[in-house]
Amino acid sequence: YSYDLDSFMIDLDSSTISMVYTEVFNYDIITNKKINNSDKLIALTFDDGPNYNTGKVLDVLAKYNVKATFFVLGSKAKDNKKILKREYDSGMEIGNHTFNHLLLTKYKENVIKDEIDKTSSVIFEVTGRYPKLLRPSYGVYNNIVKKIGNMPIIIWDIDTLDWKYHNSKRIASRVINKVKDGDIILMHDIYSATANSLNIIIPELQNRGYTFVTIPELFYYKEITLEKGMVYGYAR
């Protein structure tokens, strides 16, 4: 049997759940994957791309058949449309990370709106789909940002600090030593060390019984409804 729920069509049976977007988006949120209700879930998220290192990240994700969520900068997406298209065509979720990585809380409403809208337009131009998720620059927001963004705001509960360390083993250890079911991991696809760290993180956590999912998948399977203007750092 099926339920029509907030732009999703969800097909259920007794033990597994599969989900696809309706034809409005023509986008399969789960690609050749079924998840048991008892699985431990984790969501990798990547900020500040795309750039030339994003391809390395996508290569590793493909190697392990992992889907993730990319919060892209409009300014970089505009200059790297082929990489953005590859993200989307690979089944990744694409979110909005503003256009110029401004600290939105320091700016007037018209600037905030422009930063978000321009990025959404670039994403739509490349993918044919407007983003459904917002991650403000630096993860900083206020009530004005929440209102103007008009999307669920996704932050994180594990920061790999990959922007600081640029060391794949150290990046991996920050995830492996802290991870819990329902975690959202912050990474940056613009660094080669981040791509390399995935070769440590993914097989280790898969061996521990974790399944890697996109943000919409994570919250769906945790039975949490993502609401516009609300802020989420994990799914538990």
How does the language model describe each region?
Residues K56, K78-D79, D89, L102-G233:
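Catalytic domains of cell-wall/extracellular-matrix polysaccharide-remodeling enzymes
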Residues M9-Y107, V111-V122, Y130, Y220:
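Active-site beta->alpha N-cap acidic-glycine motif
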Residues Y1-A43, D59-A68, D181-R236:
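Terminal accessory/targeting
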